[in-house]
Amino acid sequence: MGEVKTAIGLMSGTSMDGIDIAVLRTDGESVVRHGPSGYFPYDPGLRGIWQKALTTAKAIRERRERPGDLGEAERKLTLAHAAAVKSFLHRHRFDVGDIDVIGFHGQTVLHRPDEALTVQIGDGALLAEETGIDVVYDMRANDMVHGGQGAPLIPAYHMALSANLPDGFETPAVFVNIGGISNLTYIGEGGRLAAFDSGPGNMLIDQWIEAHTGKAFDKGGRTAAGGSVVASLVARYMESPFFSANIRRSLDRSDFVPPQKGEVSLADGARTLSHLTGAAILKSASYLPEAAKTYVVCGGGRLNPVIMEELAGLAAKQGARVIAAEEAGFDGGAMEAEAWAYLAVRSLRGLPLTYPGTTGVKEPVTGGVLVRA
């Protein structure tokens, strides 16, 4: 075992609703102890800035460019993360010296793997200065330099967690992370990894609900629960080349868009998109080395009972079971933030963050940029 570090992971996903924070004690190979976790929502005004940044970022041709007001958005995003870290440390009675490193994801504003271009705004140096803690950030870029898709990165952490799956779960088990975009991690015999983005997660549902109601998401799946699946709309989405391509690739939030207003009712749209999330997962799972017997679901999507119902119903037809991460003894809400803590420690040790079976990179590579406080 290597030197055990206490790391904080920070994650701001495609939903752009807030910051997930988690503490992890790890040597970058095994998980020694799970620490506290938390969630800090963005102020509504800041969320609007991040949404505007998505449009501005379309002009980027080189990953260090910050056109228009993107530089100011990056500064505000970093300061919001710093404030969240300080509040979290105070709440859980940590001193700055108790934390060895922060794993900082930032906010993805552009992801074009076919152009080897990915941009996560977030100033690691400013975060280190504001918090007084060393920071590892920009963890996707080196993978792309070496021919990878830059995503997903969480499979390395899923592999560590798989060693702690309780007895009684049929294998092979597949971890399913339902964030804005969903991704799958298969862990086979001997630690064989296969992982890739599986399709839209919460993203289209969130966009649909916000466009019609002004609310950020379908809380508890209440809107979707009152609707019906529009099969023709599902079929249209499933005709996307993404689902038929032999080579799996990572997704950008612009790869799929919600239906046009008026195309279906609010409730039917929400239900259909919830079904699509499940259908996309099962379709993409057909590219795994073998069929899953258990799907372990983490991320915000596990809290939407309609998504879970649709996924479970589709999986049952294939003889598989769907469970929330908590049923396997994990914290499904903190898992992505924990992953960034874990990856930061791996980066410090020069261990691989990505593998040929996860991002398509030519060989296992490390990543991340370290900034000392």
Swiss-Prot record:
Reactions catalysed, as given in the entry: 1,6-anhydro-N-acetyl-beta-muramate + ATP + H2O = N-acetyl-D-muramate 6-phosphate + ADP + H(+)
This protein's UniProt keywords: ATP-binding, Carbohydrate metabolism, Kinase, Nucleotide-binding, Transferase
SUPFAM superfamilies reported for this sequence: Actin-like ATPase domain (SSF53067)
Originating gene: anmK
GO biological process: 1,6-anhydro-N-acetyl-beta-muramic acid catabolic process; amino sugar metabolic process; peptidoglycan turnover
UniProt source species: Agrobacterium fabrum (strain C58 / ATCC 33970) (Agrobacterium tumefaciens (strain C58))
Protein name (record): Anhydro-N-acetylmuramic acid kinase
Pathways involved: Amino-sugar metabolism; 1,6-anhydro-N-acetylmuramate degradation; Cell wall biogenesis; peptidoglycan recycling
Lineage: Bacteria, Pseudomonadati, Pseudomonadota, Alphaproteobacteria, Hyphomicrobiales
Top EC group: transferase
